Amino acid sequence: MSSFDKTMKFNFSDDSAETNVEEVLNTVYDALQEKGYNPINQIVGYLLSGDPAYIPRHRDARNLIRKLERDELIEELVKSYLEQHKEA
């Protein structure tokens, strides 16, 4: 069996204690709204492309979001979504 046939486990360090993902996303969301953008579209654009131009400098949102890895943001979003929509 080749290594391409095996499921790989994805791990990354949990340094999010320094930078709170929820706080960052809320600040970025508010900054985008204040500037008249659709926050969801802009955040998705950033997450897919990695291009910080989707996030304004307003309220230091661009610098804040760049302190976090995109995979960390996606992990937190998926985790939050599943926790809220999980059928128990």
From Swiss-Prot:
It comes from the Bacteria. InterPro entries: IreB (IPR009309). Transmembrane segments: none annotated. Belongs to the UPF0297 family. This is UPF0297 protein RBAM_024500. It comes from Bacillus velezensis (strain DSM 23117 / BGSC 10A6 / LMG 26770 / FZB42) (Bacillus amyloliquefaciens subsp. plantarum). The lineage of its organism: Bacteria, Bacillati, Bacillota, Bacilli, Bacillales.
